[in-house]
């Protein structure tokens, strides 16, 4: 696939600066429950979003792996999934330029139904491109809205492909045509284009997770720890810029998350949505910052709504549905901010797969597997609590309790 033009000197510098701290996967044995996993996350370590009964996979440096050995864990290095990223055999994946072209071509083919917008620009100046699917020529804030976003984390390229596929299916499937006439459907395939492009620089994988915004000479903030709700509260992120879960020097310090925040604040009609990640095969609902099922900042009705949403999405996708903190504690993430700060009904979907870099043959099946859940979230966008037989009245979803 084409990579675009890269300045050779910049490429050499970028690769040389990262050589001493190469990120690679390591299997860590002796991690058997959410408390063990949270202990690792509290150290600023990146253990991905997938857990096995007796181990996790650390994505980190050799020094980080050795530090766990000192703590008594058994650590085994893994071989990289592939020596090349997006090889010719995997041309189904889109780099940034190809993603933008796909969106533009889609809009050109359906000019009355597909409307391109931008959240803003990334740290390196890339457009955070999105589409609005609707028969309304201009944004209609009186219609219920639903929001889909991919790639908070750079190496999770599969999320871009699934979101693009869902975008296409909304117009290809005649049975959902009514949603185009009764909803405002907002889709952003990639929230982290800078990190995504860096992850494939030089034609090989780098297991890069964060964005590319420097702080104290260190590159990258974890965009899914940079939201303001319970930011940095609960050992669910790191204050060290060297760590993979670095939350940034302040909430919304990343231009990408700030752009998403401003868009959400300007769109009170958006009542629910999905953020796509990989590769744990999970459906996660709030909260991530606490193990409590129903903390003081959540109503019983809302908890029941999330459980019901998870159950329906499990029925169609087959993924395990659970509270986010059952995996491990997180703070400052998208789910918690969407519900805790804005009282919307977010779901994080962890796509399946055996690695962050599955072959492109995996894309179509995973997209179709997730299509019914995407439709379901759009169908209930007018009043998510209706699935537990609680009406919203004329003003949309009910307000959350005071925080």
Residue ranges and their predicted role:
Residues 1-5:
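Positively charged n-region of N-terminal signal peptides that target proteins for export
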Residues 6-14:
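Bacterial N-terminal signal peptides
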Residues 19-403:
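M14 metallocarboxypeptidase catalytic domain recognition
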């Amino acid at each position: 696939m084409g990579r675009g033009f890269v300045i050779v000197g910049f490429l050499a510098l970028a690769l040389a600066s990262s050589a001493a701290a190469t990120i690679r996967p390591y299997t860590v044995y002796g991690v058997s429950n959410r408390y063990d996993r949270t202990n690792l996350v509290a150290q600023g370590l990146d253990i991905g979003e997938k857990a096995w009964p007796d181990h996790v996979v650390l994505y980190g440096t050799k020094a980080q792996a050795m530090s766990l050995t000192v703590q008594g864990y058994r650590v085994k290095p893994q071989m990289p999934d592939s020596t090349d990223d997006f090889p010719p055999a995997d041309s189904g994946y889109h780099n940034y330029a190809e993603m933008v072209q796909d969106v533009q071509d889609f809009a050109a083919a359906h000019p009355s139904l597909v409307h391109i917008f931008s959240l803003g620009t990334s740290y390196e100046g890339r457009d955070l491109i999105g589409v609005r699917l609707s028969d309304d020529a201009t944004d209609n804030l009186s219609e219920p809205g639903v929001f889909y976003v991919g790639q908070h984390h750079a190496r999770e390229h599969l999320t871009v492909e699934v979101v693009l596929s869902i975008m296409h299916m909304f117009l290809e499937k005649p049975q959902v045509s009514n949603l185009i006439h009764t909803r405002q459907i907002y889709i952003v395939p990639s929230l982290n284009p800078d990190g995504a492009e860096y992850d494939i620089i030089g034609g090989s994988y780098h297991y890069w997770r964060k964005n590319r915004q420097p702080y104290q000479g260190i590159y990258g903030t974890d965009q899914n720890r940079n939201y303001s709700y319970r930011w940095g509260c609960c050992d669910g992120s790191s204050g060290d810029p060297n760590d993979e879960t670095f939350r940034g020097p302040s909430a919304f310090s990343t231009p990408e998350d700030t752009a998403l925040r401003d868009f959400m604040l300007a769109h009170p009609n958006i009542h629910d949505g999905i953020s796509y990640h990989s590769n744990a095969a999970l459906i996660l609902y709030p909260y991530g910052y606490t193990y409590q099922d129903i903390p003081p900042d959540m109503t019983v009705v809302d908890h029941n709504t999330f459980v019901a949403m998870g159950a329906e999405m499990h029925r169609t996708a087959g993924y395990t549905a659970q509270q986010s903190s059952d995996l491990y504690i997180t703070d400052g993430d998208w789910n918690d901010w969407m519900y805790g700060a804005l009282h919307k009904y977010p779901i994080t979907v962890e796509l399946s797969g055996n690695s962050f870099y599955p072959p492109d043959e995996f894309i179509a099946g995973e997209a179709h597997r997730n299509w019914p859940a995407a439709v379901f979230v759009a169908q209930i966008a007018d009043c998510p609590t209706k699935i537990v037989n609680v009406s919203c009245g004329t003003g949309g979803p009910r307000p959350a309790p005071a925080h």
